[in-house]
Every structure is written in structure tokens, then in C-alpha cells.
Amino acid sequence: IRYMLPIYPMFTIFAGWFLSEIIIKFIPKRYLKNYLITKCLILLLVFFISIYPMSFLSIYLHPNTRIQASDWINKNIPHGSRLAVEHWDDSLPVYGMQNYTQLTLPLYDPDTKEKWMNIESTLRVTDYIIIASGRLYLPLQKLTDCKNLPANRCYPLTASYYRNLFSGKLGFIKIKEFKAEPTIPLMNFGINDISADENFTVFDHPKIIIFKKE
């Protein structure tokens, strides 16, 4: 999305031109000459165009999910606990990390025997697993067709790990989740944007999940 920013103004111009052509073609001119009808059409158009921007802005009415998660961790997870986080992602909490022992789960590494020996030994001493975003678990669960993927980019064991983690079969249970999503004003209706570009779901307002060892 960020790479397309320079052409967004052109999109706006073309969208306005397109809507103008639709109005001219499908609405009789005698109605367009009526000031009240024209004003109502413009207001209606502005209303519908504004729905998503206003919904998206609602995300920033609350603290960033990383800050919310960090506050909760420092208040609710005992100091000295061992927190396992995924590599290639942000570490949490963003402050107060000196009060905890941080462990790393190299889940993006190829699905080798050595990788899983390392992860299993880490999980044995882990008290909490923190998933800081969908950067790994969303794409890696889809990369399981080893017949059509390079061997070092196929993750059937990692996909199985995530299924077991989310179902509670791994020995950890989900105790907290932090998420922020666009919410339509007045209706309090959330728009699930988990499949949107990483700029939204990883960098801007990531969904954070915390698991505790049973």
C-alpha cells in the first residue's frame, strides 16, 4: 500500500470523474437542475465515501495494541517469567522487558529436525507464548503443499504447531487477546481486516495473542 501512495490523488480524481459520469447518465437533467435534489445527492455521496475513513480513524481512538499488551503484561504476568516470542517480529512488552526472560521461537526457519528440537526444548521452559502479530502464523499455515514449494519454504510441521497452539493441544491456553479493527461509527460494527496488507495487520495495529502454559 505504501508504494502506491504517489498515485492515490489520481485515483481520487478518476473516482470523482466516474461518479460524475454515472450521475449525468442515469439521473435526468431536470432533477439535477433542482438545487435540493443535487444537494441531497452530494451529501449522500459524501456520507458513503466517508464511512470507511471514519471507521479506520476509530482505530486511533485507543492506545496502540502493542502498548495495551505491554501494560497488561507488566501488570498481570509475574516478573521473572519466561516469555517466548517469535523471531522476525516485535518483542513484547515494549517496556519493562528487563523484568522477564525472553526466549525466541525460530518458526520461520525451514522445517528441519534441528529446528523442532530447538523449539521443543524452548517450549519446555516457557511460561508464556506471545504472538505479536500475524506476520508468521497467517502465511506459514498456508505453505504446506510441499510438492509445489521449495523444500526450505514448506511448513507442514509449523502449520501443525499453530493448529495445536490455537486449539489448546500444545499445553498452552489463550488468556488474552488485543486487537483493533475499523469500526463503523454509530453502529459499533467492526470490519475484520486481518487479511489486509501487512502495513495494517503487522505494523499499524497488530492483533496480539498471549498464551499461558497450563
Task: Label the model's feature ranges.
Residues 40-209, 213:
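Catalytic lumenal/periplasmic loop and adjoining terminal transmembrane helix
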Residues 1-23:
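Hydrophobic/aromatic-rich transmembrane helices and adjacent perimembrane loops
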Residues 15-44, 214:
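Membrane-interface junctions at the ends of membrane-embedded or membrane-associated helices
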